[in-house]
Amino acid sequence: MKGRSAGFTLLELLVAMMVFAVLATLAYQGISGALRAQEGVTETQARWTALQRAQALFARDITQLAPRPVRDARGDRQPALVARSGQLSLVRGGMPNPLDFPRSDLVRVNYRLVDGRWQRAASPVLDAAPGDAPEFATVLTGVSRAELLWLDDEGRWRGDWPPPGAPPEALPRALRLRWELAGWGTLERRWVLP
């Protein structure tokens, strides 16, 4: 009797290669799906972080309002808080001065919405000089609309501030901010003001 030769037949090799190819494809798809999911989570997390940072910055500015009127580049007296046509200009306190320099703790802050970007500019110089223009930095992207409503002393929500006939140091009682965010819908925040 002749002994059988040891080894695999061509058919057995093809079946083994096919099984290996199927397992490799499944493993690749699993890893690829996990990486795509991780990228999506990372993008969402970055957007949430940016949103929280923008809200915290805005909240810090708005909750430290100071009733100090300012002067524009022509020397005309302007209210401490001006909100019109999607733009906001305010004076806030609380600027740190750890070295105790002889300066105020007040800051002039401006916000605006331009091409889907919520922008902020801050300046320690409250009264503008001719040619001064604030330098804006983007704090949040993907904002299709920003609506600011101010609660006056009579309990009415107003789109513009200050109301007609109000003194320059007049401040509202509360603020309602609505952002329309691309892909997320409407976000609304309210603050009781000092």
Task: Indicate residue ranges for each PLM-predicted region.
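Conserved acidic
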Residues: 19, 50, 135
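N-terminal single-pass transmembrane signal-anchor helix
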Residues: 2-31
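Extracytoplasmic beta-strand-rich oligomerization domains located immediately C-terminal to a leader/signal peptide
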Residues: 26-128
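Short, exposed beta-strand-loop hairpins at the edges of beta-sheets
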Residues: 176-183
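Intrinsically disordered, low-complexity regions enriched in Pro/Ser/Thr/Gly and acidic residues
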Residues: 93-171
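Edge beta-strands of extracellular beta-sandwich domains
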Residues: 188-193
